[in-house]
Amino acid sequence: MKFTKMQGIGNDYVYVNCFEEKVEDPAALAKFVSDRHFGIGSDGLILIKPSKNADFTMDMYNADGSQGEMCGNGIRCVAKYVYDKGLTDQQQISIETLAGIKYLDLTVEDGKVVLVRVDMGEPELIAEKIPVIADSEKVINEPIEIDGTNYHMTCVSMGNPHCVVFMDDVENFEIEKTGPLFENYKNFPRRINTEFVKVIDEYTLQMRVWERGSGETFACGTGACATAVAAVLNGHCNGEILIHLLGGDLKIEWDKETNHVFMTGPAAISFEGEINL
């Protein structure tokens, strides 16, 4: 099977062109290729497929084999793949995901995609639709106790569930210990992605993420979008927000007129190869 390893600010996936390759068991393949010792090494697997409703379909799986609804960094890499490989010559494309159809604008230099702006759609704030079990209709700056420590969380869905927690120090935070406790907390029926965020100023945030099914990753595009929405809802930020992640920076804008969130960031090919299955 031929594959391409790609990354969006360090959030790395193995990409398979399903116009040419056939994948029988994507969940098992995701677990195998994601293993950084016995496989290729990645945060998961993304299959690029035909679509009846859009230009392409993105089918994503986490490192543990669970299927994900949407990946912001991954969808930018899909856009780069299909353009750079000649599957399209359009600089405005649509990609179908389990979280709906996303629309992307490609910035091309010397025939290659260098930057992608994604319309990530509308944030979902209604608790039962995220889903979060809560007493209130929305979960904004609500208290939560994890392992004897009190936090405040804001919950947002960007097609997948996110819990955003603002704190003073994210660099020294024990995410390997606390991340799984948030992910599997009883009030999150489909588990949850958790962002731990420091406010630098009204235009800038620093973020670490514990991804459902993958653990800590270098970046999470949907998480950055959820974080930007949470920052605005909590009065920390407004307008276009620059978010510093472990792997690099993303620009996020929540357009209040359309209620759509836009994400801009890079995408890169790491290497290509062939693997015997």
What is each of the regions a protein language model found here?
Residues 1-112, 163-277:
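A glycine-rich beta-to-alpha transition motif near the start of alpha/beta enzyme domains, typified by
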Residues 115-123:
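Membrane helix-loop-helix hairpins that form the core translocation module of multi-pass transporters
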Residues 117, 152-155:
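Active-site-proximal beta-strand elements of phosphoester/diester hydrolases
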Residues 124-152:
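Active-site glycine-rich loop that binds ribose-phosphate moieties when present
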Residues 105, 119, 131, 143-145, ...:
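Generic structural detector for well-ordered beta-strands
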